[in-house]
UniProtKB/Swiss-Prot annotation:
Domain EF-hand, residue spans: 1-35, 35-70
Highest taxon listed in the record's lineage: Eukaryota
Task of the protein: May be involved in the regulation of pollen-tube growth.
Quaternary structure (record): Monomer.
Keyword Repeat: yes
Binding site for Ca(2+) 2: 48, 50, 52, 59
Name of the coding gene: P7
GO MF, any single term: calcium ion binding
Presence of the UniProt keyword NAD in the record: no
PANTHER family the UniProt entry points to: EF-HAND CALCIUM-BINDING DOMAIN CONTAINING PROTEIN (PTHR10891)
Record-given protein name: Polcalcin Phl p 7
Protein keywords: Allergen, Calcium, Metal-binding, Repeat
Organism name: Phleum pratense (Common timothy)
Tissue-by-tissue expression: Specifically expressed in pollen.
Length: 78
């Protein structure tokens, strides 16, 4: 599962800067299906625990560990 999380993080982090921006999260979630701007904002607020406007790898791992069922579904797509 750790390899899957790293692979998914890198797919979401399209510019390779080591963090996922709001626009990168939006693009990734669109791949998974229709997601409203409000849903993306809520998800970003939930995952971005330090409030810097980006999801770093540690925040991503924490979210994955708290939502294993969701991450299994995401791993199938990415």
């Amino acid at each position: 599962m750790a390899d899957d999380m790293e692979r998914i993080f890198k797919r979401f982090d399209t510019n390779g800067d080591g963090k996922i921006s709001l626009s990168e999260l939006t693009d990734a979630l669109r791949t998974l299906g229709s997601t409203s701007a409000d849903e993306v904002q809520r998800m970003m607020a939930e995952i971005d625990t330090d409030g810097d406007g980006f999801i770093d790898f540690n925040e991503f791992i924490s979210f994955c560990n708290a939502n294993p069922g969701l991450m299994k579904d995401v791993a199938k797509v990415f």
